[in-house]
């Protein structure tokens, strides 16, 4: 994987140099460069499995280079990302989140390289977001993604926008190692993943999405065919000399997706729904709800938003993920101060199991012009050993992050 990333990086650097040959001085002046450093500390109040600690430190570096031609037709972007973890080597990462060339024409654009594409509208989970692999060891909510190699063609017109994707290489999901937290009791062996496709990670995945805005309604329809971004974890053959491990297996899947957003005054109504078919099973899942924003609460500059969403999965209790019959409620406070302070608090409750809950707190504010301080907290409760949350019931944590931009 590192060799492939370096190959893409070399190709993008060559593209930058080639584009600079005509007028080097003016070309380099058009490059926007941003950098960031992050320090992160996690604390787990409860003891976990053997080898697991309660304090974890990590550091990350990201660079963001962007160039646009004078006629705004050609764009180059490069965003390498490096992460180091104090204890869990599986969290160490060298990734290209962006490394692409893009051409913008009249009513269309094409892109080749590596990028991150987001689909979705709901707060509590993103069912339709299937282009990129999740960087699962980076965040619990699955919102942090790995860069995905792609060839992308977009058409824009009065009938809406059509996005077409060819995805020639698959990124495996990351899992915590023996020393990491937020993992099953058995360690996931990522050295030999299994694939249903005979092409393994080189299977050519395909995706498309049509979207259009109808007055206050935004509508999106999507289709995906390729390697499932979620892994089935299968027990490996028992070896008396080594502890039991889990092996990831990636099935082929076909998925139809629907996402919609309706704006009505202070109300935002949201829906994400999918139908997914694999060799193992077919199922339907959906998340629907609203966010109501009270502007200027208590006569101040603060904006307070109330969030409520229902999560459904037709697999019911057999679903390997939370959210099969759950409700999520939360609030979002935007202080509108010079530091851009925001606070989000949410709780998800399983309606079939009163003892199964999870909750999160996300708060952040700027410190001066070049730093941002963030506080995140998660808790997990479950007494039923068939509940996915049961595996991480002792992994409540507090996380403090400091980002420096330059």
Name each region found by the language model:
Residues 29-37, 74-78, 110, 162-164, ...:
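Transmembrane beta-strands of outer-membrane beta-barrel proteins
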Residues 264-350:
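Detector for outer-membrane/organellar transmembrane beta-barrel domains
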Residues 53-59, 92-97, 145-149, 202-206, ...:
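Residues that define the transmembrane beta-barrel architecture of outer-membrane proteins
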Residues 290, 379, 392-406:
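Outer-membrane beta-barrel "beta-signal"
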Residues 21-32, 66-75, 104-111, 159, ...:
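Short loop/turn motifs that connect adjacent beta-strands in outer-membrane beta-barrel proteins
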Residues 70-180, 215, 382:
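Outer membrane beta-barrel
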Residues 22, 63-69, 102-105, 114, ...:
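Residue-level signature of outer-membrane beta-barrel architecture
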């Amino acid at each position: 994987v590192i060799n492939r990333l370096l190959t893409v990086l070399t190709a993008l650097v060559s593209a930058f140099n080639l584009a600079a040959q005509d007028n080097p001085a003016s070309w380099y002046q058009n490059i926007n460069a941003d950098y960031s450093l992050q320090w992160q500390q996690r604390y787990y109040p409860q003891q976990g499995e053997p080898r697991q600690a309660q304090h974890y430190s990590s550091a990350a570096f990201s660079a963001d280079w962007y160039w646009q031609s004078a006629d705004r037709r050609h764009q180059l972007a490069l965003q390498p990302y490096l992460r180091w973890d104090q204890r869990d080597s599986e969290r160490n990462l060298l990734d290209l989140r962006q490394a692409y060339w893009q051409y913008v024409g009249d009513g269309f654009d094409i892109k080749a390289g590596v990028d991150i594409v987001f689909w979705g509208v709901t707060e509590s989970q993103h069912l339709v977001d299937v282009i990129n692999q999740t960087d699962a060891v980076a965040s619990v909510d699955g919102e942090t993604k790995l860069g995905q190699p792609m060839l992308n063609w977009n058409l824009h017109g009065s009938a809406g926008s059509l996005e077409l994707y060819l995805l020639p290489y698959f990124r495996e999901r990351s899992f915590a190692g023996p020393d990491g937290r937020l993992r099953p009791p058995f360690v996931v062996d990522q050295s030999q993943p299994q694939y249903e496709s005979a092409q393994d990670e080189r299977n050519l995945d395909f995706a498309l999405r049509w979207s259009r805005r109808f007055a206050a309604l935004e509508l999106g329809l999507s289709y995906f065919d390729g390697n499932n971004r979620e892994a089935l974890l299968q027990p490996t053959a028992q070896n008396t000399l080594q502890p039991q491990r889990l092996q990831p297996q990636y099935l082929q899947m076909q998925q139809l997706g629907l996402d919609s957003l309706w704006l009505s005054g202070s109300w935002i109504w949201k829906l994400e729904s999918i139908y997914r078919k694999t060799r193992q099973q077919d199922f339907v899942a959906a998340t629907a709800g609203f966010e109501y924003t009270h502007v200027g609460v208590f006569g101040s500059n603060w904006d307070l938003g109330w969030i409520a969403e229902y999560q459904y999965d037709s697999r019911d209790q057999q679903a390997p993920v939370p959210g099969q019959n759950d409700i999520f409620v939360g609030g979002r406070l935007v202080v509108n101060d010079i530091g851009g302070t925001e606070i989000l608090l949410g709780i998800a409750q399983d309606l079939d199991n009163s003892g199964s809950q999870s909750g999160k707190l996300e708060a952040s504010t700027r410190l001066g012009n070049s730093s941002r301080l963030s506080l995140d907290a998660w808790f997990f409760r479950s007494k039923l050993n068939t509940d996915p949350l049961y595996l991480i019931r002792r992994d409540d944590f507090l996380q403090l992050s400091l980002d420096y931009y330059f």
